[in-house]
Amino acid sequence: MNLNLNEKQKQAVEYKKGALLIIAGAGTGKTAVITQRIVHIINSKWAKPDEILALTFTEKAADEMLQRVDESMPIGYGDVWISTFHSFCDRILKQEGYNIGLDSDYILMSAAQSYVFLRKHLFDLSLKKFRPYGNPTRFVSDLLDHFSRLQDEDVSPAEYLEYARALSKKDSVEKEEYEDTLELATVYDEYTKLKMKNSMLDFGDLILLTIKLFREKPNVLKRYQEKFKYILVDEFQDTNYSQSVLVNILSGLDPKKDMDKVGKVNPNLTVVGDDDQAIYKFRGAAISNILQFKQYYPKAKKIVLTENYRSHQKILDSAYGLIKNNNPYRLEVTEKVDKRLIAMESFPFDDDVVNLITAESEDAEGEWIAKEILSLTGNSDETSVKGTQKFNESGQSAFLELVPDRKYKFSDVAILVRANAHADSIVQNLRYFGVPYKLGGSRGLYFRDEIKVLISFLKALTDYTDEVSMYMVLSMQEWGLSTREF
């Protein structure tokens, strides 16, 4: 046992039997809790390593968890199933996919490959309105987004078709809406079958097909239910509905079939998350998963981690004052718990560490940031901060004057943006004022169009049967070829 765990962390680690909801605020050591819980389960002989399933949101988080568990255990205990949802489903489908007619040698398509695949087969689908004559590829991206959202919501092609056909019986539904929905449902069904026929899957298919496997082959499901004595899920607030369904099915509660079991099952299922950190709704994450956990498993124990080891108390108080605007749709309200974070570390900062700056435009904001960095690093004589607005503990703002008196290195400064596109004006100003920077996120080398094409070239050269890569190469404007020519 890690002696550095605080009391709440220790309770979470040592909890033995039944469902467990760990509400872990930012910087409260949730990764340490999950890894120490896995180690404790093994050391206490509650389960063997290969009888534990831990699911995370990203490959980076999975690797970190795997490394921490590996470092805490003797050699030979590295058999815990620690992976992302997609990697777990990929592993299951490679082994069991034949039960639902899936070729185990399927190809997993990236977003770009999915676009090329759908575009290639556009005239093989029953498209009318969504394949306009003047611009047949106009809705390709929209169709893929729509299909992806259906997958995120655990909607099968058969269910979508049933829903679409039922619209014709509703007087309140216009004919055009019915026809559009039926066209989309029909194409969703055809596109899904087309992917299966060509042994091509996308990331949404991994989740949906694993759910399909478990629903249609109860003997396969039972085998994995008996295998995994403990299931742990990290960043539960970031899971989409289908991922939550997958976890619940493995835990003995299928939301589509087993609602009569609500309150009767109490699996060894641990979910860790924080509704206040739910930021991925734009890509399908369903905050309802964590909000409804106690409804599905009313016997679940609830542990709240509030001791923060990462931040200044003023920052925590300001964030708390802001996030309370989401009430009453927060676990703090629905579960009647106190989620206010308490800083456990001291920092060599002034008390006035949280300031709100407003600018007239994106360019003005970018210019202010660049000049402020120059001022902070001692590369500018002008005081760029003339007035700021500061959040107090209640979340209200108060005006103050701020004159930086401390010099930093460029590497001491970080700029966080809500979306990659918001960084453009900032980067332009950093370049203009000569501020060195490194741009993170997913806009690096491998996401540049010319690099994608180059990779497709290399793939086509090494495997002439790779139709997706070949199509991407041939569809380049430089060749002047029509899509009907290949």
Model-derived features: positions:
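Conserved motor-region signature of P-loop NTPase helicases/translocases
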Residues: 1-67, 177, 219, 226, ...
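A basic/glycine-biased coupling hinge at the interface between accessory DNA-binding modules
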Residues: 17-19, 39-208, 214, 218-221, ...
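A short amphipathic helical element positioned immediately N-terminal to and/or at the very start
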Residues: 210-211, 415
